[in-house]
Amino acid sequence: MKYQNLLSPITINGITLKSRMTHAKSSGGLDGSDQQFEKATRYYTNVAKNGAALVCMIVGTWPDCEGKRSVMSRLNMDDPGIQEGFTKMIDEVHKYDTLCTASLMNVEPQELNISHLDKWDFNFQGDYNPNFKNKPEISAARIEGMIDDFVYQCKELKRIGFDGVTFYMCYRASILANAISPVLNQRTDQWGGN
C-alpha cells in the first residue's frame, strides 16, 4: 500500500489513535432540524468507519458569563434533549474506535478587543475589516469570565461523552487569536501579549 502509514496506529501522549487521519471541524448535518442527529450520526459514523481516528464536531452554545449566546449555532447545549442527541451520536462513533472532539469558540464580545490600539497601521480588506477596527479594550473581569466559561463547557462536554475539545481561534481576529499576538495584544496586565 502506497500510504500505509496513514492507516497505521500512532500513540501520542499515551493515547493510541487507530490511524493518522483526523476529520476537520464539520457540522455533519447539525442544522437545527428535527432529524439533525440522525443525519449527523450517519455522517460521523461513516467518517469513522472509513478510517478517521478522530472527528471534530460542531457543538452548540451555553449562555456565557454575561448571559449571551453565540449566533453561530442554533443548538442550545443546556437542553437535555440536545445533550442526549450528542451522547448517542458519540456512542455510535466510538463503536468504530474513533475519538470525538467538540469545536469550541468563545461568545466574543464583538464590541471589544483584547487591547486598545491607539494607531492602526494594518491594511486588511474584506471580511477582516469589521473585526479588526479599533474597539475598546476588554476588561480583565470579562477575560476571566471567558476562561470560566471554557472550563465549564469542557467539563460539560466530557460529561456528555466527548474525548476532547478543539478551540476555534478564527482568522477574523477573535479575542483568542488576538490574545496570543504580541502585535495585537498590547495589554500591560497579566493578560498581556509579550
Q: Which residues does each PLM region occupy?
A:
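Flavin-dependent oxidoreductase catalytic cores
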Residues: 1-194
